[in-house]
Amino acid sequence: MDNLKRKHHRALVQVFFFILINYIYIDRELSLGKNLIPLLNEYAIKTISPIQGVEYFYTFITKEVFTRDFLFPSLIIMSTVCILGIFFGPVLCGWVCPLGSFQDLLSRLGQKLFKDKYDNFIKPTLDKNLRFLRMISLLIVLSALIFKITDVGKYDPAKAMYNIFVGKFETAGLIVLLITTVLSLFIRRPYCRYLCPYGALVGYSNLIRIFTIRRNPDKCSGCNKCNEACPMKLYPGKEQQTRDVQCISCLECTSEQQCPHEKALDFSVKIGKKTIKMPFSVLFAIVLCIVLGAILITSTFAYWPFLKESLY
């Protein structure tokens, strides 16, 4: 029973942020001004969108916009993304991103429709080659920003998804969103796996993250349950440690989720001979508190009028 409850932790976080982020966009676009949730605006949310997130990183690093209302929120957001990445990898992708949550929801429908055939329509060799498109996508977005092509955000499917709720439709982003929707019925997280530039950027945190997915060969029976559970179709059951840049730190493969063998696969850090495990419930609380706290603090700075003056 306890294990069943644990399986819902990530889903609860995903639903919470999906509703929260869409509310923020709706409130901004329709200017509701009702302050149902005080001190919230779109400043912090831009780092979660696939293309806008890369734009935000680029703008912060190059200081293209250097005003106080941008600087302070940016410092908080960048610190949050980096700290979470260094400790846990791209948990924003696996736990917070609304577009990722939307694809996860569609994957459940796809699994019911196609059963064992789901996510097995593409041959492994082709799947491996298609994953390079994600890096190409990142390079295209960065090139567009360098050459001052300012409308690159119109291709962002997450932005298109938010805008649907307020009756705004950008053709380019909507087309990408529709393609993602259809493909999600056949493939798990197709946009995350093959095209997301933001995922390509933050995915490199897997190479340096302190806590990582570790397999205990003595406990592992090779049942393949962990590999089947991975939404990015990685193979944690074949590795001593999972440091693939496509891992989204969802922990669906671990012994607390899908693996039937206790301590066979966990999220931990090894210090000398001692292994410190990160329980699923603790990561649940950390992600929820840190991300929500960053949004609240960021929005507080953005709401202070005197911080909107230019630094120069």
Regions found by a protein language model. Give the residues of each.
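Short, solvent-exposed linear patches
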Residues: 250-252
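Non-ligating segments of multi-cofactor redox enzymes
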Residues: 1-228, 232, 236-239, 245, ...
